[in-house]
Structure formats: C-alpha cells, structure tokens
A protein has these predicted regions:
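Structural motif
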Residues: 16, 49, 73-75, 109-115
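Glycine-rich phosphate/diphosphate-binding loop of Rossmann-like nucleotide-binding domains
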Residues: 2-54
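Short, ordered loop/turn segments at secondary-structure junctions
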Residues: 21-22, 80-81, 116-120
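Glycine-rich phosphate-binding loop
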Residues: 58-100
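C-terminal binding/interaction regions
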Residues: 89, 94-154
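Generic secondary-structure signature for well-ordered alpha-helical cores
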Residues: 24, 36-44, 64-71, 101-105, ...
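Glycine-rich oxoanion-binding loops at beta->alpha junctions
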Residues: 51-69, 116, 120-121
C-alpha cells in the first residue's frame, strides 16, 4: 500500500493571495496570518503576490485568473462575509465557496480558503486574531500541504 501525504515545506513555492477589501480590518488580519503561515513554512516574501478585489463576490474571478496564469503553485483566498439584516449574506457566501471549489476542480490548482462566513464581527475577530486560530494562517498552511500532495500524485 502506498500512502501519499503532503509536507508543509513551501520552499521555492510561488503563492498568490486574493483579498477582499470589504471588511478590510478583518481581511488585513487574515492576510497577516496567511503571510505568517507561508513564511514560517519556507515561502519567501518575494514569492508571494497579493491581489485586492472590491468584495468577496469578486474573489472567484481574480482567483481563476491567477489559477490559469501558470505563475503559482498554490493560492489562498481571504475575505470576510458577515451576516447582516438583509439576504446579502446568503447571496454571497455560498456562491463564493462553490466557485472556489469549482476553480480547484477545473484547474487542478490547490486553493486555501480563508473567506470567513460569520454571524457577527466578534466571530470574525476571533477567527482573525494574531494567535492560534487565525484562519488565514491555517488556509495558507493547508494550501502548501495540498500543493505538495498534488505534486506527489502527478
């Protein structure tokens, strides 16, 4: 029996990060976590590109452009969709997640998903803080692992 597992070594990897400007104070903290996760696993800062888009709804199109560019080994998506008093949350959160999953399947590009979908600002702050549990950091480390898993399988 052969077992495939990805390592957490990002040395030499090129990584693209797509960030939503909406709820920027949360997204910036998630981005800091993603960059921390990448650098602590061997990805050099000069090998990281960050693209800012207006809101979470625009994340998929920028992500697909990066996934098909041939420049990256893996990508990370970063955003924060916070439930409000309208149905906007439902129209954005699900389609963004579905689109990112579809981009992975269509392109073979592993994509770490750090687009928070939370009920309130307090939950967003809990998931984007500087300590353990920063979802940006977790997504970035997962993206490195998946890039290595897929490399081993190809």
């Amino acid at each position: 029996m052969t077992t495939f597992e990805g390592s957490y070594d990002g040395t030499g990897m090129r990584v693209g990060i797509v960030c939503s400007r909406f709820n920027e104070f949360i997204v910036t903290a998630l981005l800091d976590g993603a960059k921390r996760g990448l650098s602590s696993h061997g990805v050099s800062e000069s090998s990281i590109d960050v693209v800012w888009v207006p809101g979470a709804f625009e994340i998929p199109i920028a992500t697909k452009a990066m996934a098909t560019s041939g420049r990256y080994d893996t990508l990370v998506t970063v955003g924060a969709v916070i439930r409000g008093e309208t149905a906007h949350f439902e129209y954005v959160a699900g389609p963004v997640a579905d689109s990112i999953a579809q981009i992975q399947l269509e392109t073979g590009m592993p994509i770490g998903f750090a687009v928070l979908t939370v009920e309130n600002v307090e939950q967003a702050v809990e998931r984007s803080g500087p300590g353990a549990g920063n979802k940006g950091e977790e997504a970035a480390i997962g993206a490195i692992e998946m890039a290595n898993v897929l490399k081993a399988l190809r």
